[in-house]
Amino acid sequence: MTTCGETSLLKEEEYVTDAVDHRGISARRSNTGRWRAAWFIIGVEVAERFAYYGIASNLISYLTGPLGQSTAAAAANVNAWSGIATLLPLLGAFVADAFLGRYRTIIVASLIYVLGLAFLTLSAFMIPNSDEGEVTSSSPSSLLNALFFFSLYLVAIGQSGHKPCVQAFGADQFDEKDPQEKSDRSSFFNWWYLSMSAGICLAILVVVYIQQEFSWAFGFGIPCVFMVISLVLFVLGRISYRYSKKRHGDEETNPFTRIARVFFVAFKNPRLSSSELCRVELEANPSQDSPKKLRFLNKSLLVPNDSAEGESACKSKDVEDATALIRLIPVWLTTLAYAIPYAQYLTFFTKQGVTMERTIFPGVKIPPASLQVLIGISIVIFVPIYDRVLVPIARSITKDPCGLTMLRRIGVGMVLSALTMVIAALVESKRLETAKEHGLIDQPQATVPMSIWWLIPQYLLLGLADVHTLVGMQEFFYSQVPTELRSIGLALYLSALGVGSLLSSLLISVIDLATGGDAGNSWFNSNLNKAHLDYFYWLLAVLSAVGFLTFWFISRSYIYRQVDQV
């Protein structure tokens, strides 16, 4: 006979305690979540990344072609847009975690995304000669320019709610309280990135070719169609999803309010004695892993003397959550050393390829932006090797369930990123030397007799760096933030890339100004045969090396949140 206790245990195993299904009742493990739901969401991401990179991967060619911008101005514009597009997810994640929830935020963001892509397609139809590739046409009117950039930033706004929430929603399909599902969640981040890269590869191979060889308007319209497909696919999977339980009550249930209150109360207790603080800590029994440098937050465990009647002290769990967020800041700052070099493949890597020999067969040339597909190919090849071969080997050596800790994985990618910049600098030096040998310094439209395949190593190495650093950052920031703020966690990883792009844009503008612009010996002269991208790559290699050393020093003292370790 089954006892009441056994019945309760069976019920707990059958249902996910922290999630509900689409009807709002407790989610069953057997028919919700896990890989069945995750593959639906991964499919949504594949379609969305196809749409995004259908625009982003060849944007610099559109700016220097139909819009008639200089190389430096176009690179700065691409970096600025890319930076803002990856910073805005902080806002989208805030809206999701504090108000709408992830599912509703994704729906609203997708509609804005589709609208932006539709306007972008319309703007390309209205620009004369917009189907030409690298040939700079007469500058379009201010109105058309305004429509184009309005559409572009509308896409960025749409992505801000879509990007962090879709991945967090996918990871939510695995219950971290179940050992098997917790292990599956770690693999989810690997397969998520592999599938996403497949969508990017498809966009680069298909859309870029159409944009260069046929029509920019048609090339922008295809991503719009794929974004519509993404939205439809997401809605179709709704009955299989697990949704986080929404907490009810007063304003204290808002995670942002609770964490902000920790700082407010701590600062209202500035003169709390050490003995009194120790007493409060012992009574509250906060985590012993809490670093001593952040003990000032524990002052919020005591009600301030001048507090209003009825005001209560903060809970120890809220103090731990606030402490965890602060301790992420140094790690986040050091990842900028990876984000700045990462921004270059959308701009200068592509412009290098424009000047080189691109003939595959007689009469057939490869679009320079198409080489970006090599990043995705290296990811698609290496992720299964990493997940199925290297992780078990590393696990047997390190005794860590994930093989490499998340921070070690990020560090390996940062080293590979620095090496990528070294190789890029050497290849660019060779290209400039070849141009000089053949008397092409003053002939920017001439093809330098050096194959575009010389760029392959830097693209492949960047892909390997991505597998380590970007996937590591996704898992790290998702797992190390409080459970209720996991959309914010993934937005933090994106914001690092966004700030890196903005810093890259600023760095380019400052260096271009300092070295004289197109009229002088600018490192970013529109005539790349007179430019010095090699100097810029060497500078980024040094910055990457310094950033890695700083990251290594900081990561040595980092203590993982025990509840989230895999």
Predicted feature descriptions by range:
Residues T2-D131, S137-V566:
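Hydrophobic transmembrane alpha-helices of multi-pass solute transporters/permeases
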